[in-house]
């Protein structure tokens, strides 16, 4: 018989740098999960992706065990990294702060495809392109 899920916790953590300190400790502590064990497993599975924010969905079972699924990094993080910036524009409709090429947009869309609600690459490019536009980043051919 399958274990009964008692809670689902969603967190966005820096790859390879999860610690029992907030936000991980309080979020998992209230479900009775072994926080140190989660941090070790998360850091081991994300060691090759340092510098990125990797969202994780943790399923907590009634025997206080857990399993987790790693998601793809947020589109905004990938766009900022591709553009070589620290953050998006504070006024995206007025001040454009950088640009990415169509090829970079396509590679970001391919990365994000498993987590988007489409299987079509051109649709994924439109979704990611909209995120870039809302960050004040232009898309060049």
UniProtKB/Swiss-Prot annotation:
The record's listing under HAMAP family reads:
Ribosomal_uL11 (MF_00736)
* Listed Pfam families: Ribosomal_L11, Ribosomal_L11_N
Subunit text: Part of the ribosomal stalk of the 50S ribosomal subunit. Interacts with L10 and the large rRNA to form the base of the stalk. L10 forms an elongated spine to which L12 dimers bind in a sequential fashion forming a multimeric L10(L12)X complex.
The UniProt GO MF terms for this protein read: large ribosomal subunit rRNA binding; structural constituent of ribosome
Please identify the protein, giving its name as recorded: Large ribosomal subunit protein uL11c
**Entry similarity comment:** Belongs to the universal ribosomal protein uL11 family.
Q: What keywords would UniProt list here? A: Chloroplast, Plastid, Ribonucleoprotein, Ribosomal protein, RNA-binding, rRNA-binding
List the taxonomic lineage: Eukaryota, Rhodophyta, Bangiophyceae, Bangiales, Bangiaceae
Q: What does this protein do?
A: Forms part of the ribosomal stalk which helps the ribosome interact with GTP-bound translation factors.
Q: Which PROSITE patterns does this UniProt record tie to the protein?
A: RIBOSOMAL_L11
Spell out the subcellular localization from the entry.
Answer: Plastid, Chloroplast
